[in-house]
Amino acid sequence: MDSQVPNNNESLNRFNDIIQSLPARTRLTICSLCLLDNISTQLLRFLILNANSPNIIAVLTDQTAFLSSGETEIFQTLVKLFKQIRMIYHTRSPLLSVHDVAPGLWFPNSPPPLILRGHEAFIITAIRKANLLTFLLTSLNCLNYGFELLQSIFLDIFCPNTNTVGNNSLEQSGKFLKSQAILYLDLKTQAYIAGLKEFQDETNEISLEKKQELLDLIFPSNLADILVQRRTGDSGDITLLTPSEKDFVERCDRRRENLKIVQDFNSLTQSYEWAQFIRELLDYCNKNMGLIIWGRKGRGKSPLYDFDVNEFDPQVLFSTGTRTVEFMDDQNQPSSASAFLSTARPNHYSTHTPTTDVSSKNPAITQSIVDAAVAASMSNSSSGPHSSHNNSSNSNNNGSIGLRKPKAKRTWSKEEEEALVEGLKEVGPSWSKILDLYGPGGKITENLKNRTQVQLKDKARNWKLQYLKSGKPLPDYLIKVTGNLEKIYKAKKKFSQSPNSSTIMEQNLSQHPSSAASATEDTQTHQEDSHGQNSDNMPSNGLFGNSTSDNTGFDPHLEDGM
């Protein structure tokens, strides 16, 4: 099979040689897979390209504010097409399996039939794209499945099991990574908040009885048994927990206790923002698309732009028999809280978006945001994932509207600064360990739950530079933090002496005199939003990447806006 991206004709005709001898129903499901893959890919590109812009996604997915023109129509049309194509596959579960695509031919937890040999990688890729899209669209309230589905299929989407055919043993295919555990923890938290939405009134006081009922449902006491049984098929032996699973259970216990003491609904939504969760979810998908779809890291390739069978993990072929609850016909809910979660919908930013985000209410801003977002989407769809930076630069040079993130910069609170200082004193500049102590489900507090490793390093480095510039004695906890004035000054001097640097700056200022300040602000905001987790060997996209020197891209005045 050709390892490159097939052209349209090749993609649509890939099954022509085998379908003639198949039943009519099977022919329909197999032939429709190419269309399902195409629609899923376009929708995933729309969402992933705007991962850091929650207002843009809110505009695209808001069915009640349908624009008469613009690219929201394109997005909503694609969503409708996705729903229609999904109806071709007679499945009682929201997730597709190989049995839905090839009924009577390919059964879950079984090798592909001979007639489909050579096509299995494409089939699994299309199924996984569709299932991931189902998860994301449900999260964005475009599909009405609710939080019960999101909780139950999270592990099936991001780290499915593998049934090793031949010896009837179960092996772990997708490792339960720390970044996945934090996402799962935050998803459970958002499900808890959605269950309490009825208390969003004048008093905002949460009922203790309702709180306890939801906590018992979402953070069950037998969570360890559930994880072990899912992975091994056996229950009762929690000693079989992997280190990452054990860490997740401990984080859930701590998060449960922290949620239990919050009495005010508004305080809950401010501490655990829905928009922040969506940003982190889409950012993880963007950085780990190869792992989610192909079962292994794509070595610089993305399934949204490339189809390479050499990147595909063969073991993924047998991880298609996910045991999901059949939500469509399930009428035996164990409790009222469980019944509520099956219908509870994500809040779609309505109560979680900061008050400074007003673009979705302003038609002019809305139109410019959507136009810029989809312009980036269209240019990337034809050029591949590595051309987004160049396309963005070209659009700015041509004077077109740039894609700016319409969110206010998150100011460091006193509690966050104190937690960072304590973390530096305890473990030094080990940012992952600091987040283990003070991050999501932290062992001490969760004061840094909304901060990334890059942001911690930025903040500590700016503190150190402030002390060095003022001549004050440097605290012991900042001594090992990287950064010194000499390297900063050398970097500035090198830039000022570089050819054409002043000319380029003057040209940019003359062409866009009103955008100079906003460009600096956007750069800093991007650095704040970059995720510094050690996720899946992706290239570092922050200020302090593994391959960058101490002075690369650093702004010594960053602290002024922090």
UniProtKB/Swiss-Prot annotation:
The keyword DNA-binding applies. Residues 496-522, 532-552 have a biased composition (Polar residues). It holds the Pfam family TRF. It comes from the Eukaryota. Present with 6380 molecules/cell in log phase SD medium. Binds the telomeric double-stranded TTAGGG repeat and negatively regulates telomere length. Involved in the regulation of gene expression. 52 binding sites have been identified, distributed over 15 chromosomes. A member of the general regulatory factors (GRFs) which act as genome partitioners. Acts as a chromatin insulator which are known as STARs (Subtelomeric anti-silencing region). STARs prevent negative or positive transcription influence by extending across chromatin to a promoter. PANTHER family: PROTEIN TBF1. This is Protein TBF1. The gene is TBF1.
